[in-house]
From Swiss-Prot:
Role of this protein: Binds the lower part of the 30S subunit head. Binds mRNA in the 70S ribosome, positioning it for translation.
Organism: Borrelia hermsii (strain HS1 / DAH)
GO cellular component: cytosolic small ribosomal subunit
Gene: rpsC
Keyword Acetylation: no
Name of the molecule in the record: Small ribosomal subunit protein uS3
GO biological process, one term: translation
Region (Disordered): 218-243
Description of how the protein assembles with itself and partners: Part of the 30S ribosomal subunit. Forms a tight complex with proteins S10 and S14.
Entries under PANTHER family matching the protein: 30S/40S RIBOSOMAL PROTEIN S3, SMALL RIBOSOMAL SUBUNIT PROTEIN US3C
Domain KH type-2 as annotated: residue spans: 39-110
């Protein structure tokens, strides 16, 4: 059976960026990676009451002793707390855990319907509150489509409606081209802790295709595309056919060049007195 690759890992450096931004010596890699896992785990544990309001946690390191943690949320007020109390507490907690200076920043999501993780979190939250999964998925799908998303796919898996056997249910609207690398696909996953067990929620949002200039990733340079008109009008002086006629790039001969080549060929025959 064909398996789905994560849309982010497939599009890294095409239209997606890393969620941990740092570069250190090979010997320190495992230690710093472990710290990143710890920071994300402790941050989500601290914000357990409002975990459905957090979309993403980005970690940036400029040096070994300073870490910047960027929390993306559509409700920054609930994350910051009264006079920044929550930020101060989580900062102190993480500093004790990894013995480094932590700087917490909040990034506001202005359009929650365009964020797949927030949509998945919202569905998981309502499933925990015993909402009907069929109505819930269809309403979430229509809400995102009405806001301008080009394609939506939502899938829930588990003991849906308290059924004895776990199964999956999926709804889809519009285009969701998972194999198109230039497609801007947003992906989110959440888990709903119900009385019957865990229900997994997956959301794919298609926001359009990333077009424009072609980028040469190897050289890190921008290649300017030539229009088709420029290509057809450009004359390649280095290409000459076996009769002395010059050839255009699109392999079409102009009338003027054909006559010129034919005349030069006849002159050559008369001069040498033999067929060529």
């Amino acid at each position: 059976m064909g398996q789905k690759v994560h849309p982010y890992s497939l599009r890294i450096k095409i239209n997606r960026d890393w969620k941990s931004k740092w570069y250190f010596d090979k010997k320190l890699y495992s230690e710093i990676l472990h710290e990143d896992f710890l920071i994300r785990r402790e941050t989500m544990k601290f914000f357990k009451g409002i975990r459905f309001d957090i979309s993403d946690i980005e970690i940036i390191r400029n040096n070994l002793q300073r870490v910047t943690v960027v929390v993306s949320t559509p409700r920054p007020g609930s994350v910051i707390g009264v006079k920044g109390a929550n930020l101060e507490k989580i900062g102190q907690l993480l500093t004790r855990k990894i013995s480094k200076k932590i700087n917490i920043k909040i990034k506001e999501i202005k359009k929650p319907e365009f964020d797949a993780q927030i949509v998945a979190n919202g569905i998981a939250k309502q499933l925990e509150n015993r909402a009907s999964y069929r109505k819930l998925l269809k309403s979430s799908l229509l809400s995102s489509i009405s806001k301008g998303v080009q394609g939506v796919k939502i899938k829930v898996s588990g003991r849906l409606g308290g059924a004895e056997i776990a199964r999956s249910f999926e709804v889809k609207e519009g285009r969701v081209p998972l194999h198109t690398l230039r497609a801007n696909i947003d992906y989110g996953f959440a888990e709903a802790q119900t009385t019957y067990g865990v229900i997994g929620v997956k959301v794919w949002l298609f926001k359009g295709e990333v077009l424009g200039k072609q980028t040469n990733s190897d050289a890190g340079q921008v290649i300017n595309r030539k229009s088709s008109r420029e290509k057809s009008e450009h004359f390649d002086r280095s290409r000459v056919d076996d009769r002395g006629r010059k050839v255009l790039n699109d392999d079409k001969f102009s009338k003027e060049k054909l006559e010129l080549g034919s005349k030069s060929n006849n002159d050559f025959k008369k001069k040498n007195g033999s067929d060529v």
